[in-house]
Amino acid sequence: MKLLAMAVLLLTICSLEGALVRRQAEELSLQRLVSQYFQTVTDYGKDLVEKAKGPELQAQAKAYFEKTQEQLTPLVKKAGTDLINFLNNFMDLKTQPATQ
């Protein structure tokens, strides 16, 4: 009976040790994966900064903003004019009943 209890105890301890070793191995692989992920993100960020420093990208951005401004300026002016006309019509409607 004691021999059976010792065998069960030994098997339990060995299986727990094995699980602990596997868990530690999984943690190491997870740490390695996270480390590789951060390294990749860092490398990508450095490449992006180097590309952004180039005059080509800055020229493209400047051209994009100028084109956008050229297209939006007339729309904004028209919207402002329409808003003023709408408010004037609204004010005229309010003043007409008072004069009658």
From Swiss-Prot:
It comes from Acinonyx jubatus. May stabilize HDL (high density lipoprotein) structure by its association with lipids, and affect the HDL metabolism. The keyword Cell membrane does not apply. The keyword Secreted applies. Residues 1-18 form the signal peptide. GO terms for cellular component: spherical high-density lipoprotein particle. Belongs to the apolipoprotein A2 family. Keywords: Cleavage on pair of basic residues, HDL, Lipid transport, Secreted, Signal, Transport. GO terms for molecular function: cholesterol transfer activity; high-density lipoprotein particle binding; lipid binding. This is Apolipoprotein A-II. It is found in: Secreted. The gene is APOA2. One of its GO terms (biological process) is protein stabilization. Monomer. Interacts with NAXE and NDRG1. Its main location: secreted. InterPro entries: ApoA-II (IPR006801), ApoA-II_sf (IPR036172).
